[in-house]
Amino acid sequence: MSPTRIYVDADACPVKDEIYKVAARHGLPVSVVAGNFIRVPADPSIERIAAGPGMDAADDWIAERAGPGDIVVTSDVPLASRCVKRGAEVLAPNGKPFSEASIGMTLAVRNLMTDLRSAGEVTGGPRGFSPRDRSAFLSALDTAIRRIQRSNKTA
């Protein structure tokens, strides 16, 4: 198994700075993936990936590489589903983990809300990102890293 890597679906990710700090503390490499150029700290453990044009280019890049022992940070539910199926730990920026048990219902709700929005039945979007979300994310990321490290020691 290759070393744990954190993959960040970077477009509109509000916790990139937190990811960089936690990854540095644990000595983990980070791949920051976006459709276009995105600014990242000058750190050899942080890899910037401009996946190129296309709505799903960044998602495809991450989904093709993430696997068991890796962590993916995304708010994109279809990407989360693909990565969970490949065995990666997946977290939303608010700290909510996506799992085999929860991803089916999460996808169904996402698709329902998309249909309701397109029919004009629902307006608006999710609530804003809060300090509580940031704190929950930091806790969830630390927990995921520790869980992977424990399983690597017993493997």
From Swiss-Prot:
Q: Check the record and name the InterPro entries matching this protein.
A: UPF0178
Instruction: Return the Pfam families for the record.
Output: DUF188
**Annotated family:** Belongs to the UPF0178 family.
The name of this protein is: UPF0178 protein RPC_3085
Q: What is the species listed in this Swiss-Prot or TrEMBL entry?
A: Rhodopseudomonas palustris (strain BisB18)
